[in-house]
Each structure stands twice: as structure tokens, then as C-alpha cells.
């Protein structure tokens, strides 16, 4: 971009005042910046609370209107939170809560490849003037963009103008989230209490989008799609809790309980095919050809029974132990129970030593197990339905063969750590080291071609992980009217694939061969998440090797690294006045 006078994209618009006019070929550093707008958020809230000797009630309502940073985008959010508790008798109380959120969104920019973000960051041109694009992308009834196919063909080579995407290829979605519970507490005897609680969490999403077609647009077939997604989680929890002081120095807390969980997920989508019968009338029933429909349903159930015992000695030493049974509907029904246990201990040594600067000090260690059940419908053959061929329905056989003998796996983890606080809690350190192994994991492996399937689900994979977690917090400034808190965290995680299946030492997790000749794989003996792909060939001196036709030579199946970060962390700063 040396400032040479050239014809820019808008100099090819017929009838435009700048038709045929040349301008300098120079960079415009603010071209992407000028597309975005200042976001504005308005929030209104109302709270109410009331209580007495035997009841309490609280309600909060909040409305938020958000004008987004991209043009023609808006998001409105409405929240309602209600909670209350009533003592029915001296020994019985009930409680309940409801949390609801409605979120309505218009024309938020999507993410991923093909989105505005991908356009700006990967394919954009720095000489473009965003103000000219906004004013001229729609001119005299036709659409124009910066990457026209040729001097005589104004259709985009790859991208419509960004403002066309925001004002003409519109989308909308509405999300509803509800969660609530109802429970009862009963004092059964001295130190013995009972609790029964039911919980429900539900999420619903509806979305609509249209693909507009006009003169010179990238799309040549108009379309419309809509979908709904419903997810719910229901849980029943019942437990007995016994607490007593065995001696003046030793206290006991014991819990036995039972949980029943149910998860449901339903996805329904529909889109037009072949265009629209009536132009600019965006409903699925206006499809020129038979519309495409898709529905997916997933139901899973889990049950658990557990017991926990905690012992505390002189507020110095604590020991906890638990044992539980878990049943999962996604495993073989004849072998779907997993037994696990957990033992932890902690010692508060700051109670025994007198260090003026030390406010609190604790060391801890523990061992825990947890179940890992397979995904839904891995034990039963399922078939997907497709678009009917005339009056004949169509169904597809899955590529992965179901395994009716599939069971759950187990995670075993050991953890050590300490927690220190100094100077009346003005400075703190929390450190943890963990070492875990996941065994008997359900994994999809390559199946023999003679089976008619490409993959098979089996229980065999073993992975091991270790890492550290460090959190540091402090209050550098503390006065009567001002408080400044700082916190930082740092963590590492190394996950290694130890075993997959006899005769199989790698599994392809994802593939982008069409774009980058790259696979995401797990390989025995390597850290999880290896990127495998082609790499330019080098000679013994590190020079790039070229073929006889002048093109670069490549070697396939080369390791480029893995997707796991060396470390993660963050810093939080909070000021209160």
C-alpha cells in the first residue's frame, strides 16, 4: 500500500458519483474499529423483602436493555428471583425459590468461520473505508461489496458487505431459563434432622434466521430456518443428618442420602429448501421444495445412594469419609452400578503455634473416586431419520456400532495442599497438587470394515493427569472508606494418554483435512490433544525443500504440538468505596 492511485470497489458502482474515480491505495488503520458502536446498557431493578419470627420472603425483579457494539443488534434481559421460608411448627419448616430469566436478542453477530469476526481478522483488507461501505453497500436498489468477482460482475467473491449481514441477513433468538426448588426440613430428634428437596432447572431456546437475496448478493437462493432447544434437569434429594459431640473435644457429623436425577434434551429444527414460493415471506411453510426437518431427543437417568461421616477433633483435626453407589441409565442395565469412596483429612496447625503474622494455617490431603458413565444411547442401536424421498421415508444407520455391554469408568484422584493467611487475612496463599487417573473409559475405536461400521464403542481407555493450582490474594489498601482487593490464580494440567485399546495406539478426535490437512488426535504415550498434519520438508541444513515444479514439498503425519496450554491463570482487582 504505497499510495498509488487505483480504482477502489465503489468506483465500479454504475451511476455513483465516484464511478471511475481513483483514490490512493493506502492503509486505513480504523476501518474495522469504525464498524463498531458504543454499547449502551440500561438496568432497572426492584427488590422487596419481609420477614418475621417464623417466616422470611425476598423478591427481586430486574430489566436490562443492551444496545450491542455491532450495528442493528439489541439484547433485552429480564430476571425474577423469589425465595422464602416458613416455619410450620417448632420442628418443621419449608422453603422454596424460583429464578427466571428471559433473554431476547436481535442480530447478534455470530462467531466461528464465516462470521464477521472471521471476515475482519482473516480476510479483510486494510485500505477499506468503513464509512464508504456503510453508505454505498446498497445503492440504487442493488447491493455492492468490497470483494466483487470482476469489473463486470458485482457479486461477492466470498463476502457480502458487513452492514448487509447486520441489516438484511437478520436473526433473532429468545432464551428462557428457569430454576427452582422446594424442600422441607424436619427436626426428628436431638441432633437428628431430615431433609427432602426437589429441584428443577429448565432451559428453552428459540431461534430464527433468514438469508436474503437481492441484486449482487452472495446467496442466490433465499432461505429461512428456525429451531427450538429444550433442556431440563430434575432432581430428588433426601437425606438424614446426625450431629453430636461425642466428647468435649470430638464431634461427629453423619449423613445418609439418596438422589434421583433426570435429564431431558429435545432439539427441533426446520429450514426451507430450494428458496421461497412468495418472495420475502420468511416462514418454513413458504419453502419452494419440501422443507427439511430434524428432531433429536435424549433422556438419561441417574441414581445415587451415599453415606458420609465427618469427625472433628478440638477444631484442629478433621477427617471425612464417604461411600456411595451410582447407577446410570446410559450403561449396560445389568452392570450399571459403580461403587466409589472418598477420604480426606485436614489439620489446622495455626492453632498450635504462635506466629504473630500468621492468621490461619491448614494442610490437607485426600483421595476421591467418582463415576464416569458413557454417553446416551451408546448401548442401543439408534437410527436417524432423513428427508423423505417422495412418499418413502429415509433412515440412516449410524457409523458407530452400539455396545450393549458398555459400562462406566472411574476417576481416582489424590490431592495435597495447604492454605495460609497472614496479617489478619490481608494476604493469603492456597496451593494444591493433584494426581488423577481415569480408567475403563468409554471410547470409540476403529472397527473392522467387514463389520459394516467404521467405529465401535468399548471400555478400555486410560488417561492420567497431574497439575498444580495456586491462588494468591491480598488487600493492599484498606481504610474506613476504601478497600482494594487483589487476587491471582495459576494452574497447570498435564494429561497423558496411557492406553486406548489392544492394537490401537491413536484415535482421531476431530479433523480439518479439507482446510489445513490437520487432525486432532490422542496418541498413547503422548499428552492428550496432539495436532497432526503436514509440514514443509526440510533438508539436513534446515532449508525448505522444493519440488522440480517449484512447489513446496511436504511431509504428512507430523506432530505440530498439542492444544493443552502450559498454564492458565488470571488476575482480579476489586475496589470498593
What are these regions (language model features)?
Residues 403, 534-536, 540-543:
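Solvent-exposed beta-strand/coil patches in large extracellular/periplasmic or lumenal scaffold regions
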Residues 1-23, 89-126, 130, 135, ...:
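N-terminal, post-signal-peptide soluble/periplasmic segments
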Residues 212-217:
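Short, conserved phosphate-binding/catalytic loop or strand-edge motifs used
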Residues 1-71, 109-112, 127, 136-171, ...:
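Residues embedded in well-ordered regular secondary structure
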Residues 83-92, 97-102, 153-211, 222-522, ...:
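Extracellular/periplasmic, surface-exposed regions of secreted and cell-surface proteins
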Residues 526-529, 533-535, 548, 554:
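Long intrinsically disordered, low-complexity, acidic S/T/P-rich regions
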Residues 50-54, 63, 313, 422-424, ...:
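A generic beta-sheet turn/junction motif
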Amino acid at each position: 500500500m504505497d499510495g498509488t492511485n487505483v480504482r477502489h470497489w465503489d468506483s465500479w458502482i454504475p451511476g455513483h458519483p465516484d464511478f471511475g474515480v481513483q483514490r490512493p491505495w493506502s492503509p486505513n488503520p480504523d476501518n474495522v474499529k469504525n464498524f463498531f458502536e458504543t454499547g449502551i446498557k440500561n438496568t432497572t431493578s426492584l427488590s422487596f423483602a419481609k420477614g418475621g419470627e417464623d417466616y422470611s420472603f425476598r423478591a427481586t425483579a430486574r430489566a436490562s436493555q443492551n444496545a450491542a457494539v455491532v450495528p442493528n443488534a439489541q439484547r433485552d434481559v429480564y430476571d425474577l428471583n423469589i425465595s422464602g421460608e416458613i416455619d410450620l411448627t417448632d420442628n418443621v419448616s419449608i422453603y422454596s425459590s424460583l429464578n427466571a430469566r428471559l433473554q431476547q436478542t436481535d442480530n447478534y453477530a455470530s462467531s466461528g468461520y464465516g462470521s464477521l469476526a472471521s471476515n475482519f481478522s482473516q480476510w479483510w483488507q486494510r485500505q477499506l473505508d468503513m464509512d464508504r461501505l456503510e453508505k454505498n453497500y446498497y445503492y440504487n436498489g442493488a447491493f455492492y461489496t468490497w470483494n466483487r468477482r470482476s469489473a463486470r460482475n458485482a457479486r461477492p467473491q466470498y463476502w457480502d458487505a458487513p452492514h448487509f449481514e447486520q441489516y438484511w441477513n437478520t436473526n433473532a433468538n429468545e432464551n428462557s431459563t428457569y430454576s427452582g426448588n422446594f424442600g422441607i426440613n424436619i427436626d426428628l430428634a436431638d441432633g437428628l434432622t431430615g431433609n427432602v428437596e426437589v429441584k428443577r432447572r429448565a432451559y428453552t431456546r428459540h431461534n430464527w434466521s433468514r438469508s436474503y437475496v437481492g441484486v449482487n448478493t452472495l446467496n442466490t437462493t433465499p432461505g429461512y430456518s428456525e429451531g427450538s432447544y429444550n433442556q431440563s434437569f430434575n432432581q430428588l434429594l433426601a437425606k438424614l443428618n446426625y450431629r453430636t459431640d461425642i466428647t468435649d473435644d470430638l464431634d461427629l457429623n453423619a449423613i445418609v442420602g439418596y438422589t434421583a436425577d433426570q435429564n431431558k434434551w429435545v432439539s427441533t429444527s426446520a429450514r426451507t429448501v430450494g428458496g421461497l414460493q412468495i418472495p420475502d415471506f420468511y416462514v418454513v411453510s413458504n419453502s419452494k421444495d419440501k422443507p427439511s426437518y430434524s428432531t433429536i431427543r435424549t433422556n438419561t437417568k441417574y441414581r445415587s445412594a451415599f453415606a458420609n461421616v465427618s469427625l472433628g477433633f478440638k477444631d484442629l483435626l478433621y477427617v471425612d469419609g464417604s461411600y456411595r453407589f451410582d447407577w446410570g441409565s446410559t450403561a449396560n442395565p445389568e452392570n450399571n452400578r459403580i461403587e466409589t469412596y472418598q477420604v480426606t483429612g485436614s489439620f489446622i496447625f495455626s492453632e498450635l503455634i504462635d506466629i504473630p503474622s500468621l492468621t490461619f494455617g491448614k494442610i490437607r490431603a485426600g483421595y476421591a473416586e467418582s463415576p464416569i458413565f458413557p454417553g446416551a444411547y451408546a448401548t442401543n442401536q439408534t437410527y436417524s431419520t432423513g428427508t423423505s424421498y417422495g412418499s418413502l421415508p429415509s433412515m440412516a444407520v449410524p457409523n458407530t456400532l452400539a455396545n450393549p455391554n458398555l459400562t462406566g469408568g472411574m476417576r481416582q484422584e489424590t490431592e495435597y495442599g495447604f492454605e495460609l493467611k497472614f496479617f489478619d487475612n490481608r494476604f493469603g496463599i492456597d496451593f494444591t497438587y493433584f494426581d488423577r487417573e481415569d480408567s475403563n473409559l468409554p471410547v470409540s475405536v476403529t472397527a473392522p470394515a467387514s463389520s459394516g461400521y467404521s467405529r465401535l464403542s468399548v471400555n478400555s481407555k486410560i488417561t492420567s493427569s497431574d497439575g498444580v493450582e495456586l491462588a494468591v490474594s491480598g488487600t493492599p489498601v484498606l481504610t474506613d472508606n476504601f478497600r482494594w482487593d487483589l487476587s491471582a490464580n495459576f494452574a497447570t494440567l498435564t494429561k497423558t494418554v496411557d492406553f486406548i485399546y489392544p492394537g490401537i495406539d491413536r484415535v482421531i478426535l476431530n479433523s480439518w483435512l479439507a482446510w489445513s490437512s490437520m487432525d486432532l488426535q490422542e496418541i498413547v504415550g503422548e499428552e492428550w490433544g496432539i495436532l497432526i498434519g503436514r509440514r514443509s520438508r526440510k533438508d539436513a541444513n534446515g532449508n525448505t525443500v522444493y519440488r522440480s515444479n517449484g512447489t513446496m514439498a511436504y511431509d504428512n503425519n507430523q506432530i505440530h504440538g498439542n492444544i493443552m496450554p502450559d498454564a492458565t491463570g488470571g488476575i482480579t482487582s476489586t475496589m470498593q468505596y
